[in-house]
A protein has these predicted regions:
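Beta-sheet-dominated scaffold domains
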Residues: 1-166
Length: 166
């Protein structure tokens, strides 16, 4: 079990053979900042979480390597540091398609009336999703790509991955 605080990651362990309320121990395994507004997601052997980076969002790929006793979080947005704005609210994971989607809120939208087919939607972050595609070959990541999908006259209010609505 991997747990997040604003500044660290912890793994649940036990001081005994089984985990009980008296034997449970939280071990700090890394000290990456974490944006508490965005829930981390698991994707296979990895966990993805976001960080605030100046006026943008960074995404980290957390992994644990039992062979080397390493716990690390690689910045998968290091090559696209200004791509994702700082108002991300959700990361969706799809292990079938080997992809993540980051959704951002529409802080500039002040419309309070329900949207209709005739309502003009301004070009804000709510009509955009940021997709991260990756490919592993025999346990080694061999290809990654970020893309930005802007959908005209649409306001993205959530997403569904593997029957889970966000």
């Amino acid at each position: 079990l991997l747990l997040f605080s604003d500044t660290s990651q912890y793994k649940l362990a036990s001081a005994a053979e089984t985990i009980t309320p008296t034997s449970a121990v939280l071990n700090e395994v890394s000290t990456f900042s974490h944006n508490a507004n965005v829930t981390p997601v698991s994707s296979g052997r990895y966990a993805y979480f976001s960080q605030v980076r100046n006026a943008n969002t960074a995404v980290r790929e957390y992994y644990s390597d039992n062979d080397t006793l390493t716990n690390d979080g690689l910045d998968v947005t290091v090559a696209v540091q200004t791509l994702i704005p700082d108002n991300a609210y959700s990361i969706l994971s799809n292990t079938t398609e080997d992809s993540l989607i980051v959704l951002c809120s529409d802080t500039a939208d002040t419309q309070t009336a329900p949207y209709t087919t005739g309502t003009a939607v301004s070009p804000t972050n709510a009509n955009t999703m940021y997709m991260y595609k990756y490919f592993f070959d025999r346990g080694e990541k061999v290809q990654t790509a970020w893309s930005k999908w802007q959908l005209d006259n649409v306001k993205i209010i959530g997403g569904m991955i593997d029957r889970s609505f966000v």
